[in-house]
Each structure stands twice: as structure tokens, then as C-alpha cells.
Amino acid sequence: MALRLLKLAATSASARVVAAGAQRVRGIHSSVQCKLRYGMWHFLLGDKASKRLTERSRVITVDGNICTGKGKLAKEIAEKLGFKHFPEAGIHYPDSTTGDGKPLATDYNGNCSLEKFYDDPRSNDGNSYRLQSWLYSSRLLQYSDALEHLLTTGQGVVLERSIFSDFVFLEAMYNQGFIRKQCVDHYNEVKSVTICDYLPPHLVIYIDVPVPEVQRRIQKKGDPHEMKITSAYLQDIENAYKKTFLPEMSEKCEVLQYSAREAQDSKKVVEDIEYLKFDKGPWLKQDNRTLYHLRLLVQDKFEVLNYTSIPIFLPEVTIGAHQTDRVLHQFRELPGRKYSPGYNTEVGDKWIWLK
């Protein structure tokens, strides 16, 4: 049900991307609601990816354990390379890209809580897996946004984590007994039918910070919820990164690894990036036709999230039909959520009958 709401929010997000260049004049919504999106005629008339993609059109992800400085390094790399920075996708990522950008209630965001996970990771209500499932969907949505930006503008992108590294948290949760084996099977099923449509990043940057140092940083940060994270959980995250993620990604893309001290020198990291040849991975096999189909996919947010809801009964992520209907109607009653963007009088949209 929550993923159904995520699809609805994502659909309006794509309209918001189209409207990014539109202007409001005296409260009248400029009409971008004709749904002009990239399609077959654009491709046939010459709007092809090869005309805008350059050597600077790269997808870079910065990965690492909790509190390793990923955000700072990713932002600095993006600034120095002239790329677009995508901060890490959290629970409220769909909210940040739709409507007025303000966070919505938990009922509309997977009915999960990161703070509750830190406080009680073994909660019997299934919060831990709902959280992981929702975050995967949020990262999937963000990765599609990043690829859409790359294919539309040619500008490179830098993300903090991605759908390709999301599983490290699932493995850590399972190893610590926070979730059931059925949850792992459900996650892997969803992942297998979604991630296959996406190209991996051109480059993965991994910040290697020992668990004791991670814990010291968490304590220094002072978040009362994060301070309850155990060293065993952090160690399992690190193990998943080093034993599974990095070896797998090294076959698909370039990988750079830095210590905590080295990661502080973003200038040196950028120099290392400039020396990379980027001579491996599936991006080299792409042509205008394959990139055309990829762009069609990533601009259709409903299709992006379509297979995150699969017909498998799992108590952690399944709710009844009546509750689904009630929450859906409540969501539709929120300001600006009843109709497509530009058609909601309660948020000031005018001249709707002319659109």
C-alpha cells in the first residue's frame, strides 16, 4: 500500500521535473500539463543521447559505512567536477521531489521509522524490514532521477549510495536477527526484477573507516538514536561492502577506495578521477537506441516503481484492503495531491478550465 502511494507521488514528481523551467505569472500555472515528454518522435527527429553525452557525463556514487563523510566528499566532488549532487535518499525522498517538498506523515512514507529501528531493531511490528524495503524504493526512484538528469542534460551526477549498495544493510539486518529469511527472499525478488533495467555507476568511491572510528564519530555527533547502533551491526555492514559489494562492482565499473584521512582531500580524489580510463562496464556497450529506451524508463516514475510491489504475502509490508483504501483517500485529500500538478485549486492553481 505504501509503495502504491510512492508511485502516485513519483508520478507527480516527473511532472515537476518537466515544469522545472516553467514560470508562474500572477498565480497562473504555466501550462506544462500537456505531458510533453521525451518519446519516439524526439528520437526519430534527431534528439539522441550521443549529441549531449561527453566524457564528463558520468555517474559516480560515494559509499561507506554510517558517519564516514560520504555527504561532504560527494558534494565537494560534484562542485569541483561541475556535476549535480544528489544527497542520500532517505525516507522522505519522494516528499522532497513532489508537492511543496515538505515531509508527509509516516502513514504516507512506508509506515516506518529510522529512529525506531535504531531504538528497537527487533521490533515485532516489522518496522525494520518495512524501513529497508521503503529505502530501496526511494533509492530506486532517486537513481532514476539521476539517470534522467544525465540523459536529459549530459551533466554528470554524484550520489551518496545507490540501489547497487543498498543490500549491505539488508545483510547486516539479517545477520543480526533483525529480519526474517522471508524478508530477505522478498527483497531479493524485488531487486531482481528492478535493478536489471539500470546501468551501474561509472565509478564507485568507497570510504573505508574502521568500526571503532565510526562509533567514535557517532558518539561525537550526539544523535541519541544513532548512538544505540551496535558495533556488530556496523561490522556486518563493512563486511558486506568489502566481501560482496566492492568485488562485484569492480567487475562492472571503476572503484576507488580511500581511508578516512585520504577522503578529506577532495582535490586529490578529483585528480584520481581525472586519471581513470573508464574502459570497462556496460556503459561502453550502449548506443543511441539502448539509451533511448533507458530514458523512456527513467522518466516514467510509475514504471520505475511498478515492480517494487509484487504479489507475495509478507506480514511486514502487507496491509488490508480497507486500510489501503482509507489511507489512499486520506492521501488524496492532502493539499495538491488530489489531481495532477497544476489542477488543484486548494493550492492556488487557477484557470484550470483552460488547460
From Swiss-Prot:
The keyword Mitochondrion applies. Its cofactor is FAD. The modification N6-succinyllysine is found at K285. Residues 1-35 form a transit peptide. Gene3D superfamilies: P-loop containing nucleotide triphosphate hydrolases (3.40.50.300). The gene is NDUFA10. It is found in: Mitochondrion matrix. GO terms for cellular component: cytoplasm; mitochondrial inner membrane; mitochondrial matrix; mitochondrion; respiratory chain complex I. Its main location: mitochondrion. It is linked to Mitochondrial complex I deficiency, nuclear type 22: A form of mitochondrial complex I deficiency, the most common biochemical signature of mitochondrial disorders, a group of highly heterogeneous conditions characterized by defective oxidative phosphorylation, which collectively affects 1 in 5-10000 live births. Clinical disorders have variable severity, ranging from lethal neonatal disease to adult-onset neurodegenerative disorders. Complex I is composed of 45 different subunits. This a component of the hydrophobic protein fraction. GO terms for molecular function: NADH dehydrogenase (ubiquinone) activity. This is NADH dehydrogenase [ubiquinone] 1 alpha subcomplex subunit 10, mitochondrial. Binds 1 FAD per subunit. The keyword Translocase does not apply. Keywords: Disease variant, Electron transport, FAD, Flavoprotein, Mitochondrion, Phosphoprotein, Primary mitochondrial disease, Respiratory chain, Transit peptide, Transport. Transmembrane segments: none annotated. It holds the Pfam family dNK. InterPro entries: Deoxyribonucleoside_kinase, DNK_dom, NDUFA10, P-loop_NTPase. One of its GO terms (biological process) is proton motive force-driven mitochondrial ATP synthesis. The modification Phosphoserine is found at S250. It comes from the Eukaryota. Accessory subunit of the mitochondrial membrane respiratory chain NADH dehydrogenase (Complex I), that is believed not to be involved in catalysis. Complex I functions in the transfer of electrons from NADH to the respiratory chain. The immediate electron acceptor for the enzyme is believed to be ubiquinone. It comes from Homo sapiens (Human). Phosphorylation at Ser-250 by PINK1 is required for the binding and/or reduction of the complex I substrate ubiquinone. Belongs to the complex I NDUFA10 subunit family.
